[in-house]
Amino acid sequence: MGDITVRWTQRLDGETADAVRELLAAASAADGVAPVSEQAVLSLGEPGAARHLLAEHDGELAGYANLVPAHGDHPAMAEAAVAPARRGRGIGTALVREALAAGGADARVWAHGDRPAAKAVAARLGLRTARELWQMRRSLATPQLPELVVPDGIVLRTYAGPADDAELLRVNNAAFDWHPEQGGWTQRDIAVRRAESWFDPAGLFLATDTAAPDRVLGFHWTKVHADEQPPVGEVYVVGIDPAAQGRGLGRLLTLAGLHHLRERGLGGVLLYTEADNTAAVNTYTKLGFAPAHVDVAYAANGA
């Protein structure tokens, strides 16, 4: 079987980062689902809090895990992938065991798509389900989208550039102060995404009050996955200022983005939401979305 070694590093050199990207692409192609999140991919080339665990088999890269340390009330979160040609050798189990041990109390590991291999690793290590994230999808052709009607007192506009960033950050961090990945954003988080090839200012919608046009009430950031065939849109982030809740802004902003994506000629759209976020699930269900697959975060029993 050959020797398997694992080692941690705080920062990847360019060659190793490229090798990890190739491994992740191969795993995604083999499984039909990305093995790690967008944030984990971005961290490959960016200095930051994330740590990187590399597994080598016979001297070649065979697996990768990303670990974001615990911060505030949020436990450490890991994600892992194994090269398709190197599976069945215990590499996934070794990565998950080491990542959870390094993450400390209540550390968790994502299983994107919760595939049979991930379930087997969880069972082998005695892990429990700690969190579920649903991917929901709908066609943009049928059922027909509801009409977009902007109520009196609300202005709906698109992103005007970095001048909007302070308000965008304020609303995001207020809306997601409870969220381990989406909360606590900085200017850097927006700048990195603005530099991505998919970024389109015409697809980032902001709602303001006519009485206070400089204060953002909520936003909807859309995204297009051009690498999928056919391309698919995404309800990337919908954030509402807690002080503006109860005004129907979530539905309004979501609809604005859906109409925009349909006008771009896309046939389908996806989104991610916490399975236990009943209000969000109900809103999206009423807009024609249905669960497509589930991502599961596992933790050690008793953690």
UniProtKB/Swiss-Prot annotation:
Reaction(s) the record says it catalyses: 1D-myo-inositol 2-(L-cysteinylamino)-2-deoxy-alpha-D-glucopyranoside + acetyl-CoA = mycothiol + CoA + H(+)
What are this entry's molecular-function GO terms? mycothiol synthase activity; protein-N-terminal-alanine acetyltransferase activity
Q: Name one GO biological process term.
A: mycothiol biosynthetic process
Residues that bind acetyl-CoA 2, according to the entry? 238-240, 245-251, 277-282
This protein is called what? Mycothiol acetyltransferase
Positions that bind 1D-myo-inositol 2-(L-cysteinylamino)-2-deoxy-alpha-D-glucopyranoside: E38, E181, K223, E234, Y272
Q: Which Pfam families match?
A: Acetyltransf_1 (PF00583)
Q: Which gene encodes it?
A: mshD
EC numbers for this chain? 2.3.1.189
Keyword set includes Transferase = yes
